[in-house]
Curated annotation (Swiss-Prot):
Keywords associated with the record: Nucleus, Ribosome biogenesis, rRNA processing
Every BRCT domain range: 332-422
InterPro entries listed in its UniProt record: BRCT_dom (IPR001357), BRCT_dom_sf (IPR036420), PES (IPR010613)
Organism in which the protein naturally occurs: Arabidopsis thaliana
Listed name of the protein: Pescadillo homolog
Amino acid sequence: MPKHYRPTGKKKEGNAARYMTRSQALKHLQVNLNLFRRLCIVKGIFPREPKKKIKGNHHTYYHVKDIAFLMHEPLLEKFREIKTYQKKVKKAKAKKNEELARLLLTRQPTYKLDRLIRERYPTFIDALRDLDDCLTMVHLFAVLPASDRENLEVKRVHNCRRLTHEWQAYISRSHALRKVFVSVKGIYYQAEIEGQKITWLTPHAIQQVFTNDVDFGVLLTFLEFYETLLAFINFKLYHSLNVKYPPILDSRLEALAADLYALSRYIDASSRGMAVEPKVDASFSSQSNDREESELRLAQLQHQLPSSEPGALMHLVADNNKEVEEDEETRVCKSLFKDLKFFLSREVPRESLQLVITAFGGMVSWEGEGAPFKEDDESITHHIIDKPSAGHLYLSRVYVQPQWIYDCVNARIILPTEKYLVGRIPPPHLSPFVDNEAEGYVPDYAETIKRLQAAARNEVLPLPGVGKEDLEDPQNLLYAGVMSRAEEAEAAKNKKKMAAQEKQYHEELKMEINGSKDVVAPVLAEGEGEESVPDAMQIAQEDADMPKVLMSRKKRKLYDAMKISQSRKRSGVEIIEQRKKRLNDTQPSS
């Protein structure tokens, strides 16, 4: 028997040994499809794409090591135990033994995903990097109505709302918010925590409707994992501020749907108490609860104090009592709305504006009981309103639309309010997530904002083609001007020569077509022979194609893809400019 002989079925090699199909994985684990999906979601296992699919393209493949990883998961045994226990409950209900069924439901086995969080995210930075989808999902379910058909319970909706308010309270107190954009899908936010940029989407404050084309079973499994992950992150973030977690809210404010305001007051009171009294004697342990409650009430009453007052005690690290070093971006964001007081009308998105204003150093209030200050407060500087008001108008404040808040935040300056007054069409709401220079089109209002930013920094905007280093070094600018003038003169001379040669070529070609025997004297430059001169455009095209000929196939394809992308971008810019021109032409007539 030759050495290379291998009996069929004895050993697999290559992709057949590294991957298995989903049906093979189900047989290997002895679970159904729903349970397999739950395990893959909570464990972070996803399908693979092998280069050579042994069983065909219509199968889903998983790595063999991932399936072996699931085989030894303790959660698998817990799911089987729960399934067996549910059969006992079902049997008791079938025998109409309601008391036994109720007793069994109270003793049903439970499980936690804490171990999986620590397993999937060894460090806190790893968890922050994977937080975008988590925040978007939790914010979505926080506004959904409870549904028995989709197995969405009320307590789960309340838990999502609690987690989102805790997250927003930390973002507001730490001034970590960086960008906000209101779109048709919802409101996009971007915050920066420990150097990580976190972007999430929140739905608008309207009635949400369940759709039939979404598998809510899979979404609820993701939500179960994301709730645990966000609770871990909130715990870590609150302890970095010396604040106890979970927070204890004022029941009165919580009943008035002022959860975010109650959380902010709780953070202020907790940080003040922990920073002033880092150690408490055991003899005063009986009075500690009363002291904490009194400080919480005091913080709720002292709502008119700006957040940059002795609340700087919030910026203490948990392990040592030293101030946290703030970067320049945080300092700018913290003082953008400093000493400004805003009042929100009923029709504006209160929760979003409250988060944005407080995150950038402002004070905010609203209509209703439990608000920090009343509408008739003379110190209010801006009244956020979305429709003309028939009530009393105060001359000491400015009535602006909500878009003014978001545009000021993205521009990092206080914009003029003339274009945002009530009843006027506001300027375009520009996205801070788009790089206008890279896209090749800069809107007019973006240029206006850039000039306002330069004026706020007492800077001089350079002319097109002139950089800041040229303004700082005039001699360099003069030298560049002289060189560019010499280059322009030489280019003009070459252009004139090429035009003469091209004209001669066209005349010769025309005479040849007409059958004329007259010969036009060639127009030659000094030092050139009597050879026929090719077209200037052809020479330029050959020069442009020469580097492409010398490229490898891979680089040539990449170059072609870049050219296609640039042409599409240029065509998109041309479409935008045409629409802008048509709009400008129709505006005066209307």
